[in-house]
Amino acid sequence: MKNRVTAPTWAEINLDNINFNLNNIRKLLKEDTKICTVLKANAYGHGSVEIAKFLENKNVDYFAVARLEEAIELRENNIKMPILCLGFVPEESLEYALENNITLTIYSLEMAKKLNDISEKTGITANIHIKIDTGMSRIGFEASEESIDQIVNISNLNNLYIEGIY
């Protein structure tokens, strides 16, 4: 295999442009519509911590990341806004997520029950979003009567607070 020499690549992010875009998007929405800024994969390679620090004082309601490690990185950099973890979180990391005030994605009744038990043990109510599988066959509840019943069961768990569904 030959060694390849490649030119360095970089992207310059103009924060004023982000602010301009955000303000224009906000104008199109109803006043009480919430905005979640997705910062997964280091804000798609543009610096999640830097972007989060900039947006924290703007008219944004949530941040979202793919993995728990990304959420923890934001918390370790003093990001206080709500952070939704969109992806899988191992059972052994659920308590750590709760302790760091990370909103979790629920994609099965089994996971919800485990999280409810951990929430009860720690005394920390878990904020959650319910994930619906929209056809990608990754994670989420299928469009079925059984899933509806499971989501109703989740809504009756005492230590979980359903903030949203996607």
Spell out what each predicted region is:
Residues 5, 9-12, 20, 33-166:
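Active-site-proximal beta-alpha core segment in soluble small-molecule metabolic enzymes
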Residues 1-3:
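Short, basic/glycine-rich phosphate-binding loops at helix/coil junctions
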